[in-house]
Amino acid sequence: MKKVLALMVAATLGLSSVAFAADTTATATPAATSTTATVAAQTKATQHQKHKVTKKTTEQKAQAAKKHEKKASVQKTPVQKAQAAKKHVKKASVQKAPVQKAQAAKKHHKTAKKPVAAPAA
């Protein structure tokens, strides 16, 4: 355990001579108490850096979400479909075939009235 703590301190400080000095049992005990304090301080420092990194990633996600919202608001295809529907409604209202049939029916009624009037005279 003492060697592991000494190696952790050596790795964080970048000093290989500290690991070799920790092999002696007399210096390992005081070094262990100081290493736990330094390791705890360094882990707190790294945790703060991790929080900063996560904040940057959330900002990037927010920018990507904004881009997606712009794409959703640009869609104009439903408006085009509505215009096409309006054109179909105009075609349906233009039909005058029933009016022509009514005029033809009126002509038939007139011809029917003439023969009825002729025998009565």
Swiss-Prot record:
Keywords recorded for this protein, A-Z: Periplasm, Signal
Compositional bias (Basic residues): 84-93, 104-113
Keyword Cell membrane: no
A Pfam match: Asr
Primary localization: periplasm
Intracellular or extracellular location(s): Periplasm
Region spans: Disordered: 40-121
Family annotation (InterPro entries): Acid_shock (IPR023497)
Modifications the protein undergoes after translation, according to the UniProt entry: Proteolytic processing gives rise to the active protein.
NCBIfam families: acid_shock_Asr
Full protein name: Acid shock protein 2
Organism in which the protein naturally occurs: Yersinia pestis
Gene name of this polypeptide: asr2
